[in-house]
């Protein structure tokens, strides 16, 4: 098994040249309702060298933590990245993403978010991205996957788009060109039907 610490320090996030990352000053918020999963992700992040890890057990608590750390424009203790679970009581990951992307404070609205889900399908990725997730991971998350996606949002952030009813990172879809076309394919009805099937 690869050492997660060396994985995070040596991953290039898609580049051919290796980079070294100093993540000691980074602050990551984990929003996860299962304590075991939250602790597992915390220990992986510590192995990567992340200096500050904050946990919340539901979307509503996540909002409180984000507001506390990122609500003040002059704060030096901002959360840099949010890892959030999709399905949780008291505010799920999609609700939290919608709140973040609709927030009036840029320090919250542009915060990178990695959505985690136990369901592996293209539709999960599409719905997650439609709600503003920068990246989507399938649980159980490996150290390699987490390090790769974390460094990707740090090193190669997606440009943000504003469209009617949507603000968030560009999904970089391969099958639809820019040219002003609607790039999002999930409607509220699609999301409702998806939740009914779970």
Go through the PLM ranges and name each one.
Residues 7-15, 155-198:
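CheY-like receiver
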Residues 92-109:
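Short amphipathic alpha-helix used as the core "switch/output" element in two-component signaling
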Residues 80-87, 117:
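Active-site residues of response regulator receiver
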Residues 141-154, 162:
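C-terminal output helix
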Residues 89-90, 121:
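The feature encodes the CheY-like receiver
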Residues 35-60:
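Two-component/phosphorelay signaling modules centered on CheY-like receiver
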Residues 42, 95, 109, 120-135, ...:
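Alpha4 helix (beta4-alpha4-beta5 surface) of REC/receiver domains from two-component response regulators
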Residues 55-81:
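Acidic, metal-coordinating helix/loop segments flanking the phosphotransfer/catalytic sites
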């Amino acid at each position: 098994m690869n050492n997660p610490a060396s994985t995070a320090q040596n991953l290039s996030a898609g580049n051919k040249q290796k980079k070294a990352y100093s993540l000691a000053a980074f602050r990551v918020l984990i929003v996860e309702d299962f304590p075991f999963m939250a602790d597992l992700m915390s220990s992986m992040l510590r192995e990567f060298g992340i200096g500050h890890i904050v946990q919340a057990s539901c979307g509503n608590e996540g909002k409180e933590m984000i507001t506390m750390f990122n609500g003040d424009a002059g704060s030096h203790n901002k959360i840099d990245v949010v890892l959030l679970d999709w399905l949780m009581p008291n505010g799920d990951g999609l609700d939290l993403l919608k709140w973040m992307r609709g927030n009036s404070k840029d320090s919250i609205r542009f915060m990178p978010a990695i959505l985690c889900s136990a369901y592996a399908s293209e539709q999960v990725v599409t719905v997650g991205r439609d709600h503003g997730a920068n990246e989507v991971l399938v649980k159980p998350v490996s150290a390699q996957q987490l390090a790769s996606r974390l460094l990707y949002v740090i090193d190669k952030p997606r440009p943000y788009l504003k469209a009617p009813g949507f603000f968030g990172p560009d999904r970089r879809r391969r099958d639809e060109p820019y040219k002003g076309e609607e790039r999002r394919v999930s409607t509220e009805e699609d999301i409702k039907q998806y939740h009914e099937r779970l």
